[in-house]
């Protein structure tokens, strides 16, 4: 299993969150010290927050969704069940911008 940034996977997030779609946001590491990925969960609970990236209607999702960067997490790759799709480069850039905002990394490039 080799999840790539921008891919959407169904992931087992445990009892509280169950199985849900997540976007992989960690870089690909050919020799990872741990078999972990960073992810942002997708949700249908839209709050129009700067921590959300609205997604267009995607054929592999049942409903319109948002990527909620406040839910950023990590999990072992063995909890990824199956890949269901991929986000476009433009949406991934919006997701990166939202992550930079959430983590207060906007000043890092100045």
Task: Give the predicted meaning of each segment.
Residues 1-110:
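Conserved functional hotspots at enzyme active or ligand-binding sites that engage polyanionic ligands
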């Amino acid at each position: 299993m080799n999840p790539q940034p921008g891919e959407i996977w169904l992931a087992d997030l445990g009892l509280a969150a169950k199985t849900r779609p997540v976007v992989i946001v960690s870089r690909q590491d050919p020799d990872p010290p741990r078999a972990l990925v960073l992810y942002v969960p997708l949700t249908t609970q839209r709050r129009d927050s700067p921590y959300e990236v609205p997604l267009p209607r995607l054929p592999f999702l049942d409903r319109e969704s948002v990527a909620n960067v406040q839910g950023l997490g990590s999990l072992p790759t063995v909890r990824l069940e199956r890949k269901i799709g991929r986000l476009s480069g433009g949406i991934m850039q919006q997701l990166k911008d939202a992550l930079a905002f959430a983590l207060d990394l906007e000043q890092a490039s100045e």
